[in-house]
Amino acid sequence: MTQAVMLQGTASDVGKSVLVAGLCRIFYQDGLRTAPFKSQNMALNSGITPDGKEMGRAQIFQAEAAGIAPDVRMNPVLLKPTSDRKAQVVLMGKVATDMDAVSYHEYKPRLREQILTVYNSLAQEYDVLVLEGAGSPAEINLRDRDIVNMGMAEMAQCPVILVADIDRGGVFASIYGTLALLHDSERARVKGVIINKFRGDVTLLYSGIEQIEALTGVPVLGVMPWLEVDLEDEDGVALQKGKYLRTDKRDIDIAVVQVPHISNFTDFNALAAQPDVRVRYVRHPEELAGADLIILPGSKNTLGDLVWLRESAMAHGVLQAHRQGVPVAGICGGYQMLGDTIIDEVESGLGTLPGLGLLNTVTHFAQDKTTTQVEGQMASALPGWLAAASGLAVRGYEIHMGETTLNAQCQPAMTLRKGENAIADGAVTDDGLVFGTYLHGLFDSDAFTRALVNGLRVRKGLTPLDHAFHYAQYKSQQFDLLADAMRQHIDIEKIYTIMQQHREPV
């Protein structure tokens, strides 16, 4: 009989995703077959399963914490905002349609049966399912059609643990207010509270914990300290709050342009984990000063972000830096923006726009989205500072709705294996100062990333490092650190008891 527990939050960005990953790691360490589940995820950070399905990055890294391959059933509904009012709806890993918020709210009840079927199929295969809610269960205006918080807990018949963020202040009010706004049947599902992101002397909380337990009748299962573990973030909230704003000095400085619709900024986690690299996310042209490499990231609204580049003067800043000899790279949408022309009759309604003109390429948007995991190797004779990366193996995934054609003065950056075919991907200029690719996750390829960083070191007159950095091993260590901290600060045995007392046949 499958056991399950669901983490819901008093608000967005309280740390649910990380704590779910931690529980997945703990149960995995304890020998239980464990899988994460989030019925509906809204995020621009997505990834691709081994069978070519698109799902949220949060559930992918939670699956990694559980020691299993990601499966689209772990995130059957993915919403990818394309503007402030509309989102692309991805169902079971494939694009279904675009909807505005009102239309989607009306549509949600039709998804309940499919979500429950998917959940039950996972429950047949795993000992424990760790569910994650979205935002807060106290969104009373959305309650009647909820499929991700208490609505999902009811479908799964599972207990709920409420996560509250003390770092933002008002933690006891947020706990009390959330519980007060729940219906009696919903409140009865909440079996514990975790206070997250605490800094300071925990004894100062004890009297408050006693009072909130008396007021609500719900026990506090633990107080998690603020942790310096390096794990992925689900969406752009962390960027907006400056989590990735690093001030420490490193040998190599990489500036990632933070376009308004940035997607898959997790591409750069492996770069930031390098011992000699500082990755900065920048929004103003003056912040490009001192960069050894400028990267244009992926985007869910490529032409909209291209317009922003020009209106914000960031385009001028990138072009000026390039004229001064600073290398420029682009990933997916960023690669498209580096070209001469983008022809879009699908995504934005903006038609045809000139790109930055740093690559002699033309991109045509298409209706069909490419979603696949791929492996390949860099071109055999890369020019300039990229030479050390020539011929190296790379792997990653593609998520894009465009095809890019290369013209004169640039060559393919790599060759990717797709089934029996070898397909050229990306582009690099003859001098090597500009390159782009559709390959997300490129920097997770350890040898390539070290060669790229060493190329930047040589340009600065620094000695290359022989440091062998293994990003997959590093991530595994971070999961273990998280699990250790949770075992120390949370009553994990109580969580086991909660699951055992409330497990129900699927």
From Swiss-Prot:
Domain GATase cobBQ-type: 251-448
Pathway: Cofactor biosynthesis; adenosylcobalamin biosynthesis
PROSITE patterns: GATASE_COBBQ
Cross-referenced Pfam families: CbiA, GATase_3
Residues of the signal peptide: none
UniProt entry keywords in alphabetical sequence: Cobalamin biosynthesis, Glutamine amidotransferase
SUPFAM superfamilies listed in its UniProt record: Class I glutamine amidotransferase-like (SSF52317), P-loop containing nucleoside triphosphate hydrolases (SSF52540)
GO terms (BP aspect): cobalamin biosynthetic process
GO molecular function annotations of the record: ABC-type vitamin B12 transporter activity; catalytic activity
InterPro entries: Class_I_gatase-like, CobQ/CobB/MinD/ParA_Nub-bd_dom, CobQ_GATase1, CobQ_N, CobQ_synth, GATase_3, P-loop_NTPase
Active site (catalytic residues): 332 (nucleophile), 440
Similarity annotation: Belongs to the CobB/CobQ family. CobQ subfamily.
Matching HAMAP family: CobQ
Function in brief: Catalyzes amidations at positions B, D, E, and G on adenosylcobyrinic A,C-diamide. NH(2) groups are provided by glutamine, and one molecule of ATP is hydrogenolyzed for each amidation.
Protein name: Cobyric acid synthase
